[in-house]
Structures are given as structure tokens and as C-alpha cells.
Amino acid sequence: VYFTTGPDYMKDIRLVELKDGKIGVFSRPRNEEIEKKYGSSAMIGFAVIDHLEDLTDDVIFNATPIEGIFGKGEWGGCNQAYLLQDGRIGVIGHQSFSQPVEGEEDLAVYVNISFEFDPVTFEVTNQKIIGTRGCYPEGPSKRPNLRDCTFTSGIVMREDGKADLYGGMSDVEEGRITIAYPFSCPLN
């Protein structure tokens, strides 16, 4: 059922129910102001709404950028969000940067990341890389500059306490690897 439209060119809009019943909204603000202020072409933004009907393009567009996830020249987004038992949010996402290669087009490097986010204080903890292109099976690349790219699709929790991490490989195929449970706290 259709219920809203996000801002033009906005990717990585994800929702998560919070401990108090409100809804956390992740977005990916991307504009010249963001790049000038943070040195990153795209950040992860966060806002809280009371009801699904409150989700508008203005809420998504004006979500507060979360600082400290990306360094200068990096960008990324939230691909999946889980409420943790302690009220924080476990996030699976992607982190990206361009890597110069002599005599070639710069590589677009995308890695799979996880971190824990406090929706009250905006503190980011336990941030780590959970997968890179080299962790996945070998395969073709759509273009040479995408050979080191794995775009995070999401994770599926397993009964053995691990997780299956899915990622788009070099813009051509989908792969799966098994990783340790990425968060320091159980899911709610």
C-alpha cells in the first residue's frame, strides 16, 4: 500500500520501530552543503516521528546528519536497521570512497559496515567493516572501476547465532557470506 514519497534523488530511506513505540527514520542527505560541512558527499540522517502518517518528504529531507561515521571523501547509507534490547539501533550499511588507480578510472570501493546508534544522544559505537568484495565469491564486474564494490543488501539472522550477509557484487551479482553476529546487544 502506497503511503508517502521521499525527496527527489534520496536513497537509503529505512524505518525502525523504537523502544517507546515511535518510528526512527534513516535517510541519506546528499548535497553541496553536506559536502562542505562534513567533507562527505552523502551522510546518514536520522529523525523520529510519532506515527507512520507523519512520514513526509520534509521529515526525510531534514533528518539530522549523524556525525562520525564517514571520513572526508567517504559516503554511505543505512541498508537495514534493528531495534536492540537496550534501545539502541543496530545498523547494517555501506561505506564508500574513491581510490585512485594509476592509468585507470578511480575505483569505487564499497564495503559492508555495521554500527550501533543511540537515537537519543546520536552516539555511534561498535562501528566496523563486516564485509569487503574480497570476502565474497569471485565474479565479473559491470565496469573495471566496480571490481572492489560490494553493496550491502542486508542480513538474515541464523539460529546458530551468526548472520548471513548479502551483498551486490561489482554491480553484477548477489553474494552471501556468513559473519559473526555484528552487534554487542541482542535484538529486541
Annotated model-derived regions:
Residues 1-11, 16-73, 83-145, 158-162, ...:
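Beta-rich carbohydrate-recognition and catalytic domains
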